[in-house]
Structure formats: structure tokens, C-alpha cells
């Protein structure tokens, strides 16, 4: 059994050793909740990695969106190359849940596009938890949605070893039962093929490696792993576990039992609808449910089988669904990253799901058991936590109330200080800001401006563009890929000024930013709360020459608290630097930037120099193209699609220029 072991040239510095010791001691003392209050750029991820290494517990890291989850996953893979680090997020590229709008009598069918690569990673995560303890899973809030019963999942897992007495047809039957399909032509993930005495399987948790079971009569002679693309043998296996192709797979016995319960619930519900004189709804429900029952009986599943998950699990009405949290051992450790954002997100999930399901049940599209295919309520989520570390620069009341220990991490390894904050009057703020922008850009730095409304962001962008400032705006209407493109352009200097609303809070750690301007800072509200202001101020904490300007006529409570907190941290940081003779230095290229797209900008910046280096060393262009193509495939494999696209463009340019 592997142990967590960090591979890094860095050692904990600054506040990190004290924070690590404090939190590890608290966890070992059996405390349920603790908080890591770490400022931007203080190396919170490295602290988390050290806590995992010291406590040796299976770990779940909860992030508030897919992008940050992917970034954290990549960082932890670097820290723990010899351990299992998995990525668990929603596998939908596009998802339209089924819904009914009574006002217009409109039923919207469920429509979804599933990302096969992410589905594979989800299976890889759950199967890893069944096999090992040295497992870290980085997940989005998707992990609080129903996932199927882990006990049934374990029970249906097929365990095979050389020398076992197993009939080939018996193994095939079991594979079909756990929703694998036979396909001798299009051999893909979740399928198997038969070639003489050999049975080839591509497990649900892999797409590049297959398992070959070689039979001799009724005995398993040998088990080998092979490359799906080339067919080359990779190695011998002494044991293999084939996990179900679906998290909602169930045994024949469970399905038969479930069908009887579904039929009973249908009968009860039809009586209720008929008594209420809802003849159309009763007819609709009968037709739809009987069709689902027939599909389950014949195929072992039906479209929307998750709506019957409570019955398949054998749970009572109203009980919480089984989720990824139930796949972890009882002593697992959880980190909630950016907890001030993630926890409210977890809290909001249940209500939205319930209101949509109510219409579906009332109007005969679903049985009441559909209510129990849902995310966890917040109280249920709390009850499933064993031990948790809340991680945030601005922890909320909940985190502080539920923590026995709060460990502060204020010192940055780079010696960088929290920025200087200036307060200037609102009158003439735009003209004053224009002067500051010019001075900042002339020094080769960038500017972030936060406004209160989308309209103001757009108007200010237009105004600055008319003054020949390279400005652009970013708000909620801009999709993720466009957002990444804008950040890349900002880092490259194609854009000097980025204007936004609250999108400028978490996840925009850009070292080139030397000025953050907060317009209308005294308009108290959620965009100008203490938490929002501290997070926004933090965007200027990656550059040694940065400052923050708040435009305000009054000093609100939130402003006062955020300014005092920033000043408190700044004093601690300056004293530490003086004591240890540290000069603050701008991080030009951190361990890894939070937004994945920023890595692409570094690729583009280095592109010309790479080509020049290659020319000096007499490396042929063909060789360089080959190298970039390998990197592109690796990036796509690691879900770094923006980086892969950038490399693709570089390859295209190289090919055109070499003609």
C-alpha cells in the first residue's frame, strides 16, 4: 500500500511550517473543523500537500468550479507523482435537465452531451477509492449529487486472478450484467471483445489500456495489460478488478426487487392522481413509467434511471442519496478550497433541484421517488464530513464558528507584501484613473478595474478605448473560453486594462498587474463587502510594485475592516522580511497559475525564443514540429484544451513558414 510522499524542490517557508504543524496537530487530536486562513500567493496548496503527507489520510479537495478543480488536480499530481490523484467533476459538456412549464404546457426532455474523457476520470476516481488509501480526489460540487450505491458498486466489481477456475462465458455474462457491451469492431471504453480463448476488456476507468484474460479450459491462464492503440503487451497482471461501466449498475436480483417497488409506487401515485381528477397526468405517468420498467427488465437500465436511484439503493423516501463522499473510508480528510464561495454553492444546490422536480411529479412526468435523486441538503453534507480544513483568504462566519483552530498564513515565500491602499474622492475618478493607467502601462504593467454594473464596465471600456487605451471588459455574459482568452491577452500585453464586476475576485492571480482600481468602493453591498474587497485587493498581491486605489467619498464598515486587515498583514509581512533580510520579488511564473489558460500565454511568449534556440542548435523544423505535436497530444490528454489549441496554432505557423 503506497504512502503519500511529496516530490518537490521546495521546503515549507514563512508561515507555512507553523500552519502545517498547527493544522496537523488539530487533525491528529481528532478535531472536526479547522481553517487555513491564507493570503493570496502564500502557498496554500503546498501547505495542503504537506498536511496530506503528514496525516496520510485519503483526501477529498472540494473546489467551486471545474477550472479551479483542474488546476488543483494538476498541482497535486506534480506534488504526488507516485500516488493516485483523480479529477471528479460533472461529466456534462452540455446539460438541459428535464422540466415542465405548466403555464405554457411545455415539457422539456432531458438533453445532455457527456464528455467521455471526464466520465472515464470519474470511474477512475471511484475505482481508486476501492483499491487504495493513498488517493486524493479533487472535485467540484458535482460530488454532492447521487452516484449510485458504493456497496452495490463493490459487490458488482469483478475480481480476477491467474489460476482462478472461471468459465469464459460466465465472465462474459457478468460483464454484460455490469453494463459492458460486446463490440468486436469498435473496441472502446466500457466494451469487450472475444478472440478464441482470449477475452479483451477496456475498463470503464481507462481508454488507452486494455486487459486481456487468457483462458485455458475453465481456468484463467494469465492476465495481461495491453496498449489499445498498438496492441503491444505492457505487462503481466497478478490481479485485476473490473468495476461497473455505470455507477448506477445493479445486480439482476436488485433490479427485480426494484421493479416490484416501482410498480407499487406507480399504483399508489395513480390512485392519488385519479382521486384529484388528474386523468391526463395519470395516463401520462402510467405510460412513461411502464416504458421505463420494460427497459430496466430487458436492458438493465433505462434513460433517466437515476430517478429511480432511491429504489435501486433500497433507501426510504426522503433519505439522502449515496454520493462520492460515501465511497471514501470513514477516516477521510476534506479540504474546502475558497470556502467562502464553495460553501454557499453547496448550500444552494438542493432548493433549485427541488423546485424543478415538483412540477415533474405534480403533472405526471415522474414518480415521487424522483425527488430523492438530488444533491445533498447542507445538513446532510455536514453529517458526511469526517474532518475538514476550510481554506480561504476570507473565511466566513460559518467556517470560523465550525473551527477549533484557525491557522494564519500571512507570509509569502516570495516576500511579497499586501499592497498599499489609497482612498481618493469619487468626483473626477475617471480622469484620475486615466492618469494612473498611463503611468502603470508605461512601467510595463497591467491594470484591473472593478465596477458595480455591467453597463458601467462596458461604458468605461469604450471611453478608455477612445483614448487609445488597450482595454477590455469581462462579466458573466462572457463564456469560460472567452474569459480565458481575455486573461491570456492581458498577460501577453495585448490588453493593458481589464474591467470587470465580481469576476475579478477569485482565481485571477496575474503577476503583471500593478494597479487594482475599485470604483464606488463606498457603495455597501455584496460586491463591496469586506470579503469581496479583501479578495479584490488580493489581485494586486503578486507584484512588488502594486497598489490599490479605492474611489470613495465615505469610508464604509467594509472598507474600514478590509483596509485595517490588509494593513495588519502588511506590518507582519514587513517585520518578517526585515528580520530575515528578504527583498520582495514579483512572481513572474508561479508554480502554476490558477486559471489554466494563463499557462498558454507563457507558451506563446516562449514560442519565438524556442524557434530561435532551435535554429542556433541546427534543430530541423520537422523535429520541432514533432516535439510540439507530442506536447499538444499530452496537453489534450490532460484536459488542457486551450494549451493544446495554442500548440496547434504554433505547429500550423511552423508548417506554413517552412514551405
From Swiss-Prot:
The UvrABC repair system catalyzes the recognition and processing of DNA lesions. A damage recognition complex composed of 2 UvrA and 2 UvrB subunits scans DNA for abnormalities. Upon binding of the UvrA(2)B(2) complex to a putative damaged site, the DNA wraps around one UvrB monomer. DNA wrap is dependent on ATP binding by UvrB and probably causes local melting of the DNA helix, facilitating insertion of UvrB beta-hairpin between the DNA strands. Then UvrB probes one DNA strand for the presence of a lesion. The keyword Transmembrane does not apply. Its main location: cytoplasm. Residues 622-657 form the UVR domain. PANTHER family: UVRABC SYSTEM PROTEIN B. Forms a heterotetramer with UvrA during the search for lesions. Interacts with UvrC in an incision complex. ATP binds at residues 38-45. GO terms for biological process: nucleotide-excision repair; SOS response. It is found in: Cytoplasm. The gene is uvrB. HAMAP family: UvrB. It comes from the Bacteria. The beta-hairpin motif is involved in DNA binding. Residues 429-582 form the Helicase C-terminal domain. This is UvrABC system protein B. Pfam families: Helicase_C (PF00271), ResIII (PF04851), UVR (PF02151), UvrB (PF12344), UvrB_inter (PF17757). Gene3D superfamilies: P-loop containing nucleotide triphosphate hydrolases, UVR domain. Belongs to the UvrB family. Keywords: ATP-binding, Cytoplasm, DNA damage, DNA excision, DNA repair, Excision nuclease, Nucleotide-binding, SOS response. NCBIfam families: PRK05298.1, uvrb. A motif (Beta-hairpin) lies at residues 91-114.
